[in-house]
């Protein structure tokens, strides 16, 4: 079996269906004898350029080990699913299991302390004086 890295982007209006799609795709991979080495849900992200007049999409990354028949089934599933805007399937030499750069950046952002609240802007004294008169 060969190793593959799969990234697919889902229409932002269908973000709530992503978990079901991931379960369906991972089930089809494991039923065919493949394994999922890494699965990351990157969430909604800005696109580099508009696709079908959309500026955001929900990203999912998978690293799997499977046969060619599984890849063909996934390509068909992506092609006939209108929610999937784009997909990319790349063959890799080895199984990639470490956390991706995108996921690391997201974890670091969560670990940082939240920003201090902004000070409230007070109304101008002139406006208060005219209101009293």
From Swiss-Prot:
Biased composition range(s): Basic and acidic residues: 106-125
Region (Disordered): 106-133
Gene3D superfamilies: 3.30.70.60
CDD domains reported for this sequence: bS6
Coiled-coil blocks: none
Keywords, in A-Z order: Ribonucleoprotein, Ribosomal protein, RNA-binding, rRNA-binding
Any one biological process term the GO annotation gives: translation
GO cellular component labels: cytosolic small ribosomal subunit
Molecular function as annotated in GO: small ribosomal subunit rRNA binding; structural constituent of ribosome
Classification via Pfam families: Ribosomal_S6
Keyword rRNA-binding attached: yes
Stored HAMAP family: Ribosomal_bS6 (MF_00360)
Homology family: Belongs to the bacterial ribosomal protein bS6 family.
Function: Binds together with bS18 to 16S ribosomal RNA.
PANTHER family: MITOCHONDRIAL 28S RIBOSOMAL PROTEIN S6, SMALL RIBOSOMAL SUBUNIT PROTEIN BS6M
Protein name: Small ribosomal subunit protein bS6
Species for this entry: Psychromonas ingrahamii (strain DSM 17664 / CCUG 51855 / 37)
Lineage: Bacteria, Pseudomonadati, Pseudomonadota, Gammaproteobacteria, Alteromonadales
């Amino acid at each position: 079996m060969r190793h593959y890295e799969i990234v697919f982007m889902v229409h932002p209006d269908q973000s709530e269906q992503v978990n079901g799609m991931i379960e369906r795709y991972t089930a089809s991979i494991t039923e065919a004898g493949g394994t999922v080495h890494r699965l990351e849900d990157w969430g909604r992200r800005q696109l580099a350029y508009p696709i079908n007049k959309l500026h955001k999409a929900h990203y999912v990354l998978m690293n799997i080990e499977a046969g060619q028949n599984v890849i063909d089934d996934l390509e068909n599933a992506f092609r006939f699913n209108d929610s999937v805007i784009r997909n990319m399937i790349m063959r890799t030499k080895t199984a990639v299991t470490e956390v991706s750069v995108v996921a690391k950046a997201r974890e670091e952002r969560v670990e940082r302390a939240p920003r201090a609240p902004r000070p409230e802007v007070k109304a101008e004294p002139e406006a208060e004086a005219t209101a009293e008169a």
